[in-house]
């Protein structure tokens, strides 16, 4: 049997082609200490700050401290089963979260994993949780209103799309209720809402999910939840994950509203991590860069220019104060980062004024440019009149005799305060707010008893809706109170008032 050399050569070549040896180099290290959700790893010579690390048992970690002879990491999962001597591998990338339309209506954790039992999230797109904020050139000014549906806010402290408005107040003053109402008010307005729960009770988050589902708001909402049961690193990552999910929609030219509830607990989670990593503590034991963790998060809220799609990300961070002290470290930090704040006060809340907005020290630095003209026309003097009322009310407590003009102002102030009260889960369309506030500011309520104002408001809106339906539509479309609209509105108010007073 003759075997030709060519045949042997071809057989050898085929065999060599089959044999592929790939060498894969992985940056790795050894755990030298683990506990309290923190680990120190020896090795990882090419590790980067914020890099995603692979621990045993399918647990991931994040490198935060790059020291001379070891790397300080935080674990993004359960540390059970991880021990000294285990191998840790570097991934060469930072933490990413899944993004896309598939997340709408879902409840996810800080890593974008589902928590609602509705099955896996079908998306193959991911986005890093740390992204550089849009530059000045990429932005446009805030010029479109984001209606909250709350009279006290849309009239005096208007919020624009792309703004960062802080909601600050003690515990149990209605901060979360206020943002939930704002989310409910976005129904049908083509705004995607993201609610980030940081360090809250699981029962609270479940209640919010149920409320949004019942009201039909989960159709355009996403909830990112990192509850008190989660480790500090997961609580720390939650707002950045929520922000990345929101930025995906913003870059597509959509409007997004994101709520961080709340950044006080976020700062506490970061302080916990930093102290466990042996970083030097500063004021109130917070690390020196606690300002930076919030500023880099909130700077990502923006109104993009038309060339970049014109999308927006509006941020409503929440801060919880202790005994109304807004001069503490974290409150002052976040006040200085945001474009204004809505201050909720316990005293107002307990006296029955809800939402308990203190109009005196609440401010919106950029929202005024976004407010519709009709609302500006109506509420030009509202803040001043409320301030004068408070001053007079304090003066009247001493039992001093007031002149006729002061008494008139006092009575009007009482009615203005009453008209700004609003029930929870009942946001109002902006045209209805304009009608009600026009009635109050222009002294149409002077002969209505204070206790009848709520009833008057409800029935007036029903009357206008039945007999003057085109009036609300005109205000909504033209966004300005022309002389013709004012005349029609005054006729409607006078007609209804006559009926109301006869019934009373």
Swiss-Prot record:
Q: Which residue numbers mark the site Required for activity?
A: 362
Recorded E.C. number(s)? Answer: 7.1.2.2
- The answer to keyword Translocase applying to this record is yes
Q: What coarse category fits the chief subcellular location reported for this protein?
A: membrane
* Recorded coiled-coil stretches: none
From the Swiss-Prot or TrEMBL record, state where the protein is found. Answer: Cell membrane
Q: Which reaction does it catalyse?
A: ATP + H2O + 4 H(+)(in) = ADP + phosphate + 5 H(+)(out)
The keyword Ion transport is assigned to this record: yes
Source organism, top-level taxon = Bacteria
Keywords carried by this UniProt record: ATP synthesis, ATP-binding, Cell membrane, CF(1), Hydrogen ion transport, Ion transport, Membrane, Nucleotide-binding, Translocase, Transport
Q: Gene3D superfamilies from the entry?
A: 2.40.30.20, ATP synthase alpha/beta chain, C-terminal domain, P-loop containing nucleotide triphosphate hydrolases
Q: Where does ATP bind?
A: 169-176
Instruction: Give the way it sits in the membrane.
Output: Peripheral membrane protein
The UniProt entry, under Pfam families, shows:
ATP-synt_ab (PF00006), ATP-synt_ab_C (PF00306), ATP-synt_ab_N (PF02874)
Gene Ontology MF annotations: ADP binding; ATP binding; proton-transporting ATP synthase activity, rotational mechanism
Please tell me one Gene Ontology term that the record gives under cellular component.
plasma membrane
Protein role:
Produces ATP from ADP in the presence of a proton gradient across the membrane. The alpha chain is a regulatory subunit.
Subunit organization: F-type ATPases have 2 components, CF(1) - the catalytic core - and CF(0) - the membrane proton channel. CF(1) has five subunits: alpha(3), beta(3), gamma(1), delta(1), epsilon(1). CF(0) has three main subunits: a(1), b(2) and c(9-12). The alpha and beta chains form an alternating ring which encloses part of the gamma chain. CF(1) is attached to CF(0) by a central stalk formed by the gamma and epsilon chains, while a peripheral stalk is formed by the delta and b chains.
User: What PANTHER family is this protein classified in?
Assistant: ATP SYNTHASE SUBUNIT ALPHA, MITOCHONDRIAL
Q: Which family does it belong to?
A: Belongs to the ATPase alpha/beta chains family.
HAMAP family with a match to the protein in the record: ATP_synth_alpha_bact
Name-wise, this protein is ATP synthase subunit alpha
Naturally occurring in which organism (per UniProt): Clostridium botulinum (strain Alaska E43 / Type E3)
| Gene that produces this protein | atpA
């Amino acid at each position: 049997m003759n075997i030709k050399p060519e045949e042997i050569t071809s057989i050898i070549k085929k065999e060599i082609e089959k044999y592929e040896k790939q060498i894969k180099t992985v940056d790795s290290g050894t755990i030298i200490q683990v506990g309290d959700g923190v680990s120190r790893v020896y090795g990882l010579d090419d590790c980067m700050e914020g890099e995603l690390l692979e621990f045993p048992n399918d647990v991931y970690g994040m490198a935060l401290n790059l020291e001379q002879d070891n790397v300080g990491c935080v674990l993004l999962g359960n540390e059970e089963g991880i021990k000294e001597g285990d191998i840790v591998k570097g991934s060469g990338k930072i933490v990413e979260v899944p993004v896309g339309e598939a997340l709408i209506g879902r409840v996810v954790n800080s890593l974008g994993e589902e928590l609602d039992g509705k099955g896996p999230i079908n998306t193959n797109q991911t986005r890093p949780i740390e992204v550089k904020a849009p530059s000045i050139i990429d932005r446009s000014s805030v010029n479109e209103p984001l209606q909250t549906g709350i009279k006290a806010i849309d009239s005096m402290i208007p919020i624009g799309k792309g703004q960062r408005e802080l909601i600050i107040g003690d515990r149990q003053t209605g901060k979360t209720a206020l943002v939930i109402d704002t989310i409910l008010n976005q129904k049908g307005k083509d705004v995607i809402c993201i609610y980030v729960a940081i360090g809250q009770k699981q029962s609270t988050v479940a209640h919010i999910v149920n409320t949004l589902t019942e009201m039909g708001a989960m159709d355009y909402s996403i909830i990112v939840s990192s509850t008190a049961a989660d480790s500090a690193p997961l609580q720390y990552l939650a707002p950045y994950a929520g922000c990345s999910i929101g930025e995906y929609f913003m870059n597509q030219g959509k409007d997004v509203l994101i709520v961080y509830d709340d950044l006080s607990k976020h700062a506490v989670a970061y302080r916990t991590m930093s102290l466990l990593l042996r970083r030097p503590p500063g004021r109130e034991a917070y690390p020196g860069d606690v300002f930076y963790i919030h500023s880099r998060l909130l700077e990502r809220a923006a109104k993009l220019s038309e060339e970049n799609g014109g999308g927006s990300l509006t941020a409503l961070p929440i801060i919880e104060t202790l005994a109304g002290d807004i001069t503490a470290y974290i409150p002052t930090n976040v006040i200085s980062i945001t474009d204004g704040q809505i201050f909720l006060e316990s005293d107002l809340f307990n006296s029955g004024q809800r939402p308990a907005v203190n109009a005196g020290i609440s401010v919106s630095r950029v929202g005024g440019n976004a407010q519709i003209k009709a609302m500006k026309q109506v509420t030009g003097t509202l803040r001043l009149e409320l301030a004068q009322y408070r001053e007079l009310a304090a003066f009247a407590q001493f039992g001093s005799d007031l002149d006729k003009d002061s008494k008139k102002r006092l009575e009007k102030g009482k009615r203005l305060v009453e008209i700004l009260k609003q029930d929870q889960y009942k946001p109002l369309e902006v045209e209805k707010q304009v009608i009600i506030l026009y009635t109050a500011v222009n002294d149409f309520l002077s002969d209505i008893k204070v206790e009848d104002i709520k009833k008057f408001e409800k029935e007036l809106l029903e009357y206008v809706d039945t007999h003057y339906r085109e009036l609300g539509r005109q205000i909504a479309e033209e966004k300005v109170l022309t002389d013709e609209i004012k005349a029609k509105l005054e006729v409607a108010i006078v007609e209804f008032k006559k009926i109301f007073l006869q019934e009373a």
